[in-house]
Amino acid sequence: MKPALRLQLDRYVRRLAELDSLLADPAVMRDAGGFRALSREHVEVSGIVERQRRHAQRERDLAAAAEMASDPELAAMAAEEAASAQAELDRLATELQRLLLPRDPDDARSVFLEIRAGTGGDESALFAGDLLRMYTRYAERKGWRVELLSASDSELGGYKEVVARIEGDAVFGHLKYESGGHRVQRVPATETQGRIHTSACTVAVLAEPDEAQEVTLNPADLRIDTYRASGAGGQHVNKTDSAVRITHLPTGLVAECQDDRSQHRNKAKAMAVLAARLRDKDRLERQAREAATRKSLIGSGDRSDRIRTYNFPQGRLTDHRINLTLYQLGAIMDGDLDPVVKALVAAREAELLAELEIG
């Protein structure tokens, strides 16, 4: 193991002791938000320290096997133990290197998911509905909670635009690479000649800020409009001006919410979406600056990039960023998104490891 890696691991051992002490402090326990953040960090640090301790034990086992090898009667046993210890040491070193890669602090957060129909008219709107269903089914598999915040329905079904909140552990870490252009190739239900049409949707995944990260909004920079909600929402949906639209005048960013009968709650949710969009705008600008010096295959986050094609006649999904092709489109559209998510995460980790090797 490299000396620099050992120094990093020593810092994690010390940090684990600090976290144990902090989490036992009554003052920390009274701060629910701070306690949750420290608890999440404790889980992460504990996993690293556990592997570090196992690595140290296997190093001792390897040294003991080397001593045993000098005894002819124990040489065969020593060789077997040395091979076992070395194999586990190699595996643990790889795991530790991966765990010590730079972490996106937003990975643990819940998200706002935005899907917008693009080229393709009604077929694009129908595909937006299919994408929402795919992400909803995936969230159900993960035990996450999905809350529809606003939707603009199309005439034939689907959505011109839909915004949902997905709440749970590490939602952003799983879904952040979904941002970008999604292209679909299939025969629309309205097509009488059996011709394959191509249409597209844009997906944006925004990390939900916590209270400590909340963007400060100047009331003078906001225009708040109320209107009657439309679309699916129950029998009371059109009776009051409960829907809220908030415009951030300096940037032109807009957020709206119409899912609740309470105007007050809709306003609070719309403000949360607006804060996430402003924070995401800063993130994208920062990534654009970084991209000027380092081209990242996976993490560019450019919403104009076509990242994926869904070819229904062939049952094929292709992610163009990592040249991934899977012939299991039906299962993926039904929420089995892990094969795609894990491949993207692995590709990004490989990029980071390569950067560390170069550095």
Swiss-Prot record:
This is Peptide chain release factor 1. It comes from the Bacteria. The modification N5-methylglutamine is found at Q235. Keywords: Cytoplasm, Methylation, Protein biosynthesis. Belongs to the prokaryotic/mitochondrial release factor family. Signal peptide: none annotated. It comes from Methylibium petroleiphilum (strain ATCC BAA-1232 / LMG 22953 / PM1). GO terms for molecular function: translation release factor activity, codon specific. It is found in: Cytoplasm.
